[in-house]
């Protein structure tokens, strides 16, 4: 098994309010670690406390588990904060802090008790209604005695432990634009989170029918906070999703009615209508970087993919920053932008940068390109501004190249003229 840090869970004894002369038992459950050997130390504040640590046990999955407990008088427990510090040879320490819970006795006397109910239903209080009928002196005494007995019973009876289980939550993730365009696939992910998922089962339906393939079941995962999660993935051809086929994920659990989530492509989709690529230039030193701004607008829904290419090679995502598409003013469509950082190259060799945009309603990839010679831009003292690729208010790189060619030709002819004049003069002198 690979190296794994332990998961640490704090445990406190019972729900009954302890008496002043009875101890409080605290425990740390350390589980799911590999390799073996952990060190457990208890502290009250900064002072270590004597504890009892049980032998390690190897689970069926080859990971280890152990537990450690501390017993302390109630009065001492209320005086400070207790910590269980776990050190694993292959990972960093984990600390769990114990806090004294609210008194169960106070809870029982201040609110009526309720029987546990299924999630989503109403719980009915079980307190008896007060009797208003006059029953005479003997009846009043019996009534007082009965009320006294009921009060004593409420004070001595152990209340129900509060449930800390996490309710099941189901989430359905629709296909990412990257998968739709780069893989020509529509991948759906159904995700469930809860406290006890060993009997949970996720199923799929495509247009009301069970798919015959393309389903990938994930393993049950246990997390450090005590919760569990499980997922299932369904992969379909992109054409089915574009055709508006409905996809349904259903969670089946023995203790709950089936929970269904449906994904359906938005029918009123609109492809982008405008794409622009602007140059952001500044008068920074030659070693500084330049910036390109790609803007796209007029699309719906907001799921869109903006990528950058440098000479037909994909740029790493760490080199540019996309923005989450906001809605356009007084419109049902969205707009987005991405800023690319172009580092100054060591040589004046120009590079072509392309902004590629894909949307689920576009039949083709939109793109806009710009050829940059960054060293020339950095050495030219320009006022910071935004220039559109279609405007003519700046010197193009083709013009710059022609200028250098003309100048080189002039210098070469001038040198040849000098050589010719020198040779003729030398012949005449001889």
Swiss-Prot record:
Please, which domain of life does this record's source organism belong to? Eukaryota
Q: List the stretches on the Extracellular face of the membrane.
A: 1-406
Q: Locate the Ig-like domain: which residues?
A: 6-98, 175-263, 267-373
Keywords carried by this UniProt record:
Adaptive immunity, Cell membrane, Disulfide bond, Glycoprotein, Immunity, Immunoglobulin, Immunoglobulin domain, Membrane, Secreted, Transmembrane, Transmembrane helix
GO function term, MF aspect, one: immunoglobulin receptor binding
Q: Which SUPFAM superfamilies match?
A: Immunoglobulin
Can the keyword Transport be found in this entry's annotation?
A: no
The portions of this protein that span the membrane are: 407-427
What GO biological process term is on the record, naming one?
immune response
Disulfide-linked positions: 28-84, 190-249, 294-355
Pfam annotation, one family:
ig
Regions of compositional bias (Basic and acidic residues) in chain numbering:
138-158
Entry annotated with the keyword Phosphoprotein: no
Residues with attached carbohydrate: 109-110, 113, 126-127, 131-132, 225, 316, 367
Q: What does this protein do?
A: Constant region of immunoglobulin heavy chains. Immunoglobulins, also known as antibodies, are membrane-bound or secreted glycoproteins produced by B lymphocytes. In the recognition phase of humoral immunity, the membrane-bound immunoglobulins serve as receptors which, upon binding of a specific antigen, trigger the clonal expansion and differentiation of B lymphocytes into immunoglobulins-secreting plasma cells. Secreted immunoglobulins mediate the effector phase of humoral immunity, which results in the elimination of bound antigens.
Quote the subunit structure annotation. Immunoglobulins are composed of two identical heavy chains and two identical light chains; disulfide-linked. An IgD molecule contains thus a delta heavy chain combined with either a kappa or a lambda light chains. Kappa light chains are found predominantly on the membrane IgD (mIgD) form and lambda on the secreted IgD (sIgD) form, this fact is poorly understood. Membrane-bound IgD molecules are non-covalently associated with a heterodimer of CD79A and CD79B.
Q: What is this protein called?
A: Immunoglobulin heavy constant delta
Organism in which the protein naturally occurs: Homo sapiens (Human)
Q: What taxonomic classification does the UniProt entry list for its organism? A: Eukaryota, Metazoa, Chordata, Craniata, Vertebrata
